[in-house]
């Protein structure tokens, strides 16, 4: 089931998850909806509260969307505490993931499991381009080191 991602929906899920998992300790960040095809969520620690962005390009179910929001909430939590590695997936991040898993039974991945892009956001690759890629691929593997050296020398 595909969920419609809106700022209001993400805000309501943030408030519910904040109350349940973080005892309402996180201030409400600015909520944005983006069109990222390589990341499902993003937290930027700027300003007083930061910005939480969720991509609308993926086919989310309720559990996956909650995992993405919680993942970004962990970054927000660490950033609010003043952790220097708040925006990375270091020890403090994994400690919070473990705490959430132990207390609530939810597994939070540091890199999201493979999620499907919605069809309208998939790049349409023409058939001739796909054929050319598979025909020329062995040559690209052989020539790549030489291209690197060529770029260094010239």
Task: For the regions a language model picked out, list residue spans one by one.
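Active-site recognition of the HExxH zinc-binding catalytic motif
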Residues: 67-79
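Metalloprotease/metallohydrolase-associated module, dominated by Zn2+-dependent proteases
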Residues: 2-64, 80-154
């Amino acid at each position: 089931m595909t969920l419609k991602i809106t700022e209001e929906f993400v805000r309501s899920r943030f408030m519910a998850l904040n109350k349940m998992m973080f005892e309402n300790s996180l201030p409400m960040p600015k909520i944005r909806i983006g069109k990222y095809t390589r990341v499902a969520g993003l937290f930027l620690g700027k300003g007083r509260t930061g910005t939480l962005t969720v991509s609308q390009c993926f086919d989310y179910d309720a559990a996956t969307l909650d995992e993405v929001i919680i993942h970004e909430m962990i970054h927000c939590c660490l950033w609010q505490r003043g952790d220097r590695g708040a925006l990375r997936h270091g020890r403090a991040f994994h400690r919070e993931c473990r705490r959430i898993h132990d207390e609530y039974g939810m597994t939070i991945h540091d890199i999201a499991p493979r999620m499907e892009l919605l069809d309208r956001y998939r790049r349409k690759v023409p058939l001739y381009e796909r054929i050319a890629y598979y025909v020329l691929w062995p040559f690209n593997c052989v020539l790549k080191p030489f291209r690197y050296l060529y770029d260094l020398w010239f």
